[in-house]
A protein has these predicted regions:
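A short glycine-rich, Lys/Arg-flanked "PGG" loop and its adjoining helix->strand segment in the class I
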Residues: 137-149
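A conserved beta-strand element that flanks and buttresses the S-adenosyl-L-methionine
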Residues: 123
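Class I (Rossmann-like) S-adenosyl-L-methionine-dependent methyltransferase catalytic domain
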Residues: 1-53, 64-114, 131, 138, ...
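Conserved beta-strand/loop positions that form the S-adenosyl-L-methionine
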Residues: 60
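Short catalytic micro-motifs in class I SAM-dependent methyltransferases
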Residues: 126-127
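Short acidic/histidine-rich motifs immediately flanking catalytic phosphotransfer sites
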Residues: 118
Length: 225
């Protein structure tokens, strides 16, 4: 159990059970982001994944399921996976449906051991930066090797090291590499592609300027070769 996981799980338990965005720190100055911002995330995910009614979606590090739910409603269902039993309990209480459910498991371990279950699209939003390089690479390569129907993965809300100067002084390179820091590891598109391995083409996108994190984050879309 890492310090980052302990902080993630402990923080979630300090928030009211219905404070879905506060539990997963999808906030600005401590306040939950506006619904319009969430809608932007959902629409971008649908577009980047080319999500269709017949798709089955895997949400890795899904948190409490609040972001998964509107995506599952756009497809044929699937599964959300998170390491926090508390957040998965919130997801099961508020967001489970007849065609999708939530599982307590480490994201990389799930990719390496779970049945493919017809998964065609996958999402890891705002969480890849908290995985160490080895775990991230194992997860992405296992998804390619073990999930033959999986065509696209969205790695969303990645902190861009080219923008780190907005937050950190020069010489803070060590902290930028640390997945246990408050923002996690800052990785360039080239570094993300290296983690993904040769089985994926990687395309990077930025959100519109009025998105709350557009000034320092980007999305990476992995497309099976």
């Amino acid at each position: 159990m890492t310090a980052a996981w302990t902080d993630y799980d402990t923080h979630a338990r300090t928030r009211p059970r219905g404070d879905f965005w506060g539990q997963v720190r999808r906030t600005v100055r401590g306040q939950p982001v506006a619904q319009a911002q969430i809608d932007m995330i959902v629409e971008a995910a649908v577009a980047h994944l080319a999500l269709e009614p017949g798709d089955r979606l895997l949400d890795l590090a899904c948190g409490n399921g609040a972001l998964s739910r509107p995506l599952f409603q756009r497809c044929a269902g699937g599964v959300g996976v998170d390491i926090s039993d508390y957040l998965v309990s919130v997801a099961r209480e508020h967001f489970a449906g007849p065609a999708h459910g939530y599982v307590v498991m480490d994201a990389a371990a799930y990719a390496e051991t779970a049945a493919p279950d017809g998964i065609t699209k996958a999402l890891c939003y705002g969480s890849l930066s908290y995985l160490a390089d080895d775990a991230a690479a194992r997860m992405l390569r296992a998804l390619h090797g073990r999930f033959p129907a999986l065509r696209r993965i969205l790695l969303g809300n990645l902190p861009d090291p080219a923008r780190a100067g907005l937050f950190y002084p020069a010489g803070a390179a060590a902290e930028l590499r640390e997945p246990r820091s408050s923002i996690g590891a800052w990785r360039s598109p080239v570094e993300v592609a290296a983690l993904a391995g040769p089985g994926w083409d990687v395309w990077c996108h930025t959100m519109p300027p009025d998105f709350f994190a557009a000034h320092y984050r980007y999305d990476a879309v992995l497309v099976r070769r």
